Amino acid sequence: MLGEHNIKDYTLDALNSYISFVLQKNTLFTGTIRENMLWGNNNATDEEIYEALKKAEILPLIESYKDKLDHEVLIDGKNFSGGQKQRLTIARAFLKKAGILILDDSTSAVDKITEKNIQNAISTLSEHPITKIIISQRISSVKDCDNIIVLEDGKITAQGTHKDLIANSLLYQEIYNSQGGDYNEK
């Protein structure tokens, strides 16, 4: 089911327009930053693009370029670091305004402060109903989710909120402790 309709009732194009992906290994296209952002929403205004770039914590970099949104993106985004590419593809996903946002280790190449700011921006994507599916090895990326599924060897070993899993899942506790624990939970 997707909403109140059977997923089989949707065409592939309809599903593609409803779902946005941000993968750990992301894709930037040869062209300009603006052209790359328009892949998310070809009707987006410059104002909307700048807002998405701001939410994705990449706006200061873009504003540092003389040609701003018209800055050239080389093949495979080779003129950007891994973290910069991730933030640009996150901005593109924000522009799409999809009903389902799938983030697969999408902040793995950014520092913890940037990750936290992006997570805060993701949590405020409420202009329209949105389901967020976050796949991550970092607990800090998923700790605020309504439902967390813990996998080991491809099998579900635990499920619940962060608080539930800290109390009841040894594997989750081990991962949590190995990543430094706490995460400003005080």
Q: What do the predicted segments below correspond to?
A:
Residues P129-I135:
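Conserved H-loop
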Residues L95-G99:
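A short, proline-enriched helix->beta-strand linker immediately N-terminal to the Walker B motif
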Residues M1, D9, N16, R34-I75, ...:
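ABC ATPase nucleotide-binding domain helical subdomain, centered on the C-loop/LSGGQ "ABC signature"
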Residues Y18-T27, N41, D76-G77, I139:
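ABC ATPase nucleotide-binding domain signature
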Residues L101-D105:
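Catalytic Walker B motif of ABC-type/P-loop ATPase nucleotide-binding domains
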Residues K55, S64, N120-P129, K143-K186:
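C-terminal portion of ABC ATPase nucleotide-binding domains
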Residues G3, L59-L88, S106, V110-I113, ...:
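ABC-fold ATPase nucleotide-binding domain signature/coupling loops
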Residues S81-G82, L88-A93, N117, I134:
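ABC ATPase nucleotide-binding domain "signature" region
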